[in-house]
């Protein structure tokens, strides 16, 4: 944690409702009188958004090393120009995806958990050495997620268009991450009603605020 703020990330597979729940969480915290920065990854700053467009919608396939480093480059700009300044001002930062998504998508999804890929990713992560105070892991079985994505429609990005085996590896990666760090990562059943999910997230944040003394 930097300054007096609180850094919260939301993680999970496609269709889990992270973006919606991040927005609702930010609104609820603002209603309680907190100053909140709502942001996302990859993205969150003009430079990082340019990298996001290349990663999600670019026409050229990248090597796994290049893809990891581009995520880290976007994250570095995001941290330096948005997240860290907000935390120093004492704000709560609510971020849709962060380090855990890179590990799940690039490490487990694309890299299939290969030791070489995980070692490279771990080294790159140490260069952008900053961790959330609290991570809210939205968990939703893949069939339910697919139904949501179909109902949502809209443009499909590079990761959403991957084969089912890719998404199963991503979900397995998120499960491994949550199991390895149960203090930081709080699992939330994203199959509940949106209101129930929002309530669970807000409760977890209140508990973290108490512990951190924010």
Curated annotation (Swiss-Prot):
In the UniProt record, does the keyword Zinc occur?
no
**Pfam families registered for this protein in UniProt:** Thymidylate_kin
Swiss-Prot/TrEMBL keywords? ATP-binding, Kinase, Nucleotide biosynthesis, Nucleotide-binding, Transferase
Q: Which GO terms describe its cellular component?
A: cytosol
The record's PROSITE patterns line, in alphabetical order, gives: THYMIDYLATE_KINASE
Q: Member of which family?
A: Belongs to the thymidylate kinase family.
- Which positions are annotated as binding ATP? 12-19
Q: A Gene Ontology molecular-function term?
A: dTMP kinase activity
Q: What class of enzyme is it?
A: transferase
Protein name listed in UniProt = Thymidylate kinase
Q: Which reaction does it catalyse?
A: dTMP + ATP = dTDP + ADP
Q: Please state the Enzyme Commission number of this protein.
A: 2.7.4.9
Which NCBIfam families does the record match to this protein?
DTMP_kinase
């Amino acid at each position: 944690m930097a300054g007096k703020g609180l850094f919260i990330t939301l993680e999970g597979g496609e269709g889990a409702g992270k973006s919606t729940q991040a927005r609702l969480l930010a609104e609820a915290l603002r209603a309680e009188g907190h100053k909140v920065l709502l942001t996302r990854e990859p993205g969150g700053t003009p430079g990082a958004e340019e990298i996001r467009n290349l990663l999600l919608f670019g026409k050229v396939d990248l090597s796994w090393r290049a893809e990891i480093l581009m995520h880290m480059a976007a994250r570095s700009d995001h941290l330096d120009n948005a997240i860290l300044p907000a935390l120093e001002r004492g704000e709560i930062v609510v971020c849709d995806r962060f380090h855990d998504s890179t590990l799940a998508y690039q490490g487990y999804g694309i890299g299939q958990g290969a030791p070489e890929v995980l070692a490279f990713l771990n080294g790159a992560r140490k260069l952008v050495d900053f961790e959330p105070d609290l991570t809210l892991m939205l968990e939703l079985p893949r069939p339910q997620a697919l139904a949501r994505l179909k109902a949502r429609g809209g443009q499909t990005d590079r990761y959403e268009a991957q084969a089912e085996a890719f998404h199963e590896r991503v979900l397995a990666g998120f499960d491994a991450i949550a199991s390895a760090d149960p203090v930081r990562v709080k699992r939330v059943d994203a199959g509940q009603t949106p209101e129930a999910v929002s309530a669970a997230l807000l409760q977890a944040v209140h508990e973290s605020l108490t512990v951190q003394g924010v």
